[in-house]
């Protein structure tokens, strides 16, 4: 996975009022935490954060921090992000400092690939699970996990245990969790002419 670089600054003051003032200047308040360090309050330009999590990797992008005193050069991933429910603006971000040698737990989106045979027969595709919790090394985090639905017939489902996963990926979800199914009635054959 591609590593991205993002500039941050340390934040001296905390609180609602300070956070509001930062957001008014298009700056997102955040925190960096992880194994072996105390949580550190930071701030990042909203446009820089949006650009960093856009495109390949998304929220699971490996981010090398630039600036921020002792945080300079640390590698982080986005652990949590709060958005304004109406505008979609990022209100706050939590970064988790990671080591490239230790496994991490992340959410990876599922992408349905192909047109299901059951849909061609008049059924309806019902996606039940949109992402999986996985554990892997940071450099092995997949952008998404593809689910091939091409051979899925009416009345059938695909479960977590049936997925073909990239090497080094361990799924933390229950293996019996359904991902996608096809609902509907199969087309009836035309009655034979007498």
Swiss-Prot record:
GO terms for biological process, alphabetical: translation
One function term, GO molecular function aspect: structural constituent of ribosome
One Pfam family recorded for the sequence: Ribosomal_TL5_C
Alphabetical keyword list: Ribonucleoprotein, Ribosomal protein, RNA-binding, rRNA-binding
Gene Ontology CC, one term: cytosolic large ribosomal subunit
InterPro entries: Rbsml_bL25/Gln-tRNA_synth_N (IPR020056), Ribosomal_bL25/Gln-tRNA_synth (IPR011035), Ribosomal_bL25_b-dom (IPR020057), Ribosomal_bL25_C (IPR037121), Ribosomal_bL25_long (IPR001021), Ribosomal_L25_dom (IPR029751), Ribosomal_uL5_bac-type (IPR020930)
Transmembrane segments: none
HAMAP family membership: Ribosomal_bL25_CTC (MF_01334)
Stored PANTHER family: RIBOSOMAL PROTEIN L25/GLN-TRNA SYNTHETASE, ANTI-CODON-BINDING DOMAIN-CONTAINING PROTEIN, RIBOSOMAL PROTEIN L25_GLN-TRNA SYNTHETASE, ANTI-CODON-BINDING DOMAIN-CONTAINING PROTEIN
Subunit structure: Part of the 50S ribosomal subunit; part of the 5S rRNA/L5/L18/L25 subcomplex. Contacts the 5S rRNA. Binds to the 5S rRNA independently of L5 and L18.
Xref: NCBIfam families: bL25_bact_ctc
Free-text function comment from the UniProt entry: This is one of the proteins that binds to the 5S RNA in the ribosome where it forms part of the central protuberance.
The family this protein is said to belong to: Belongs to the bacterial ribosomal protein bL25 family. CTC subfamily.
Name this protein carries in UniProt: Large ribosomal subunit protein bL25
Gene it is expressed from: rplY
